[in-house]
């Protein structure tokens, strides 16, 4: 049985813990590896190694740091197929989707390789006679990242490349449910030249999360995951004086106007609602049909019925949920939708895949006539379940969306520029897709979820990522001419 190792001070080592967590193939329930609950002593060793390495790493030339990530992105490309296969085995998403997971992280690594153009301060000459002022963006120190199960390649690559490229050292805690692809990415980072102690990896559940939040030498924590855990991390990390960013739960709505291109809209809706078995924080889990678009129900159902559920080992449309507990939760919420009066027009419960009868499978599920007081609307289901709602006008749809506490993402499908402009201006959501089912985050733009979906004023990606992992130091300088003197100045004037 494979035992997942830790990375401490440049060495891949097995934990001394007595507590090991099973990693299972979600299509078969086979235990494929075990991951440790890292001990407190081992966490302290990792932080100490990062603290020591920081003193050298922060002074390493920025071009040297950039070259490491140039090599790293090349290694990821060379190992793309291997990484996708590992990801599918432990997480369950299809091979094609797994490649996308890795590729979206790769884009952030490429962005980190351009750090010399990103970590640039400001300079103003002659702010006063003979006085110059400049600001520099310096690294914070030891930073940490806590990542979820649903994107075990992309989200770790959101975090440690930008943190390390800006001169910090890093403690990474991958999801205990699927850490193996993350560890393979870490191995490639070490191969690319990341020095000892600059990147460290610890494992486990709540005990490890709390230790990271509490450790006095960790200066910043980045988190992606559920709302409950995100609130816990933000509060606990903030109380110990850390900078924190928490990307949390979502209830993303797509608004369809009657003038939308029907075929393209239906295809994008089905992909965004049911892809990755709905286990995406950017999934479109609610569609609001405006006016005559309410007649599209049969076509929406037909698109969902055309999707093929598989074990993830091929290029079918969606794989299993991550665990039996996740499957049970999704099926329970489907049951509450029926009990509370929604119309179940497509039921994905009870589906089986030949040869994988023990898999955590739930097929595409659609509810019509959903209202805002139902649990299936109020909770993030995190499964392949689409809720259909109706609105008489765009104004009514906007009012419905703005009343929802989440603010991660939304989309509008229309051929009207005026309607799209009104939507993007009036909607209180951080990320908007126009004829796109919420755009995939790109590294040059910030991941800008808002309201109940985000805690912290800076997000991952883009300029905000550089700002999150740095602090500004302002220097005001005057060099005296030895022959010149104005005498004592007791005012605030320069």
Question: Which sequence ranges carry the predicted segments?
Answer:
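Residue-level signal for inorganic ion chemistry
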Residues: 29, 65, 87, 109, ...
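Conserved C-terminal structural/oligomerization subdomain of aldehyde/semialdehyde dehydrogenase
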Residues: 28-34, 218, 255, 305-308, ...
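Rossmann-like NAD(P) dinucleotide-binding subdomain of oxidoreductase/dehydrogenase enzymes
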Residues: 121-267, 315, 391
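ALDH superfamily catalytic-core signature
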Residues: 228-371, 434, 483-485, 490-494
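Glycine-rich loop-to-alpha-helix module at the N-terminal edge of alpha/beta enzyme cores
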Residues: 32-118, 130
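Hydrophobic face of amphipathic alpha-helices that form TPR/SEL1-like repeat modules
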Residues: 1-27
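Short, well-ordered beta-strand elements within core beta-sheets of diverse protein domains
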Residues: 32-38, 52-59, 145, 254-257, ...
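Structural signal for hydrophobic packing residues in well-ordered secondary-structure cores
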Residues: 54, 58, 73-80, 84, ...
């Amino acid at each position: 049985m494979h035992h997942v190792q830790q990375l401490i001070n440049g060495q891949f080592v097995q934990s001394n813990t007595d507590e090991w967590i099973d990693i299972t193939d979600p299509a078969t329930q086979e235990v494929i590896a075990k991951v440790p609950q890292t001990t407190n002593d081992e966490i302290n060793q990792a932080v100490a190694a990062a603290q020591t390495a920081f003193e050298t790493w922060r002074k390493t030339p920025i071009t040297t740091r950039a070259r490491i990530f140039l090599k790293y992105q090349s290694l990821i490309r060379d190992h793309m197929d291997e990484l996708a296969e590992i990801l599918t085995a432990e997480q369950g998403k299809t091979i094609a989707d797994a490649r996308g997971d890795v590729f979206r992280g790769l884009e952030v690594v490429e962005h980190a390789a351009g750090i010399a153009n990103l970590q640039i301060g400001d300079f103003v000459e002659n702010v006063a006679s003979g006085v110059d002022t400049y600001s520099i963006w310096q690294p914070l120190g030891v930073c940490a990242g806590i990542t979820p199960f649903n994107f075990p390649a992309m989200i770790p690559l959101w975090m440690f490349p930008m943190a390390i490229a800006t001169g910090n050292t890093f403690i990474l805690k991958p999801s205990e449910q699927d850490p193996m692809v993350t560890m393979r990415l870490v191995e490639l980072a070490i191969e690319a030249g990341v020095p000892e102690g600059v990147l460290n990896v610890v494992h486990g559940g709540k005990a490890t999360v709390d230790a990271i939040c509490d450790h006095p030498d960790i200066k910043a924590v980045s988190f992606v995951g559920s709302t409950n855990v995100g609130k816990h991390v933000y509060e606990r990390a903030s109380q110990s004086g850390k900078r924190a960013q928490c990307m949390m739960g979502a209830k993303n709505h797509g608004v369809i106007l009657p003038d939308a291109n029907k075929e393209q809209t239906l295809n994008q809706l089905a992909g965004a609602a049911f892809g990755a078995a709905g286990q995406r924080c950017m999934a479109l889990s609610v569609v609001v049909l405006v006016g005559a678009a309410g007649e599209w129900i049969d076509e929406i159902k037909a698109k969902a019925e055309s999707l093929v559920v598989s074990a993830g080992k091929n290029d079918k449309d969606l794989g299993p949920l991550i665990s039996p507990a996740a499957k049970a939760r999704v099926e329970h919420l489907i049951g509450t939708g029926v009990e509370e009066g929604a119309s179940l027009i497509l039921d994905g419960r009870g589906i089986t895949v030949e040869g994988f009868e023990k898999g955590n499978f739930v097929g595409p599920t659609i509810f019509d006539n959903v209202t805002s007081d139902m649990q299936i609307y109020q909770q993030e289901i995190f499964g392949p379940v689409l809720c259909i709602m109706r609105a008489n006008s765009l104004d009514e749809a906007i009012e419905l969306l703005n009343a929802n506490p989440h603010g991660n993402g939304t989309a509008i499908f229309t051929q009207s520029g005026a309607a799209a402009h009104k939507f993007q201006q009036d909607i209180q959501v951080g990320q908007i897709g126009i004829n796109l089912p919420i755009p995939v985050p790109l590294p040059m733009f910030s991941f800008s979820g808002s309201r109940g979906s985000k805690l912290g004023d800076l997000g991952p990606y883009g300029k905000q990522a550089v700002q999150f992992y740095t602090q500004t130091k302002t220097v005001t300088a005057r060099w005296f001419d030895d022959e010149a003197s104005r005498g004592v100045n007791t005012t605030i004037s320069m």
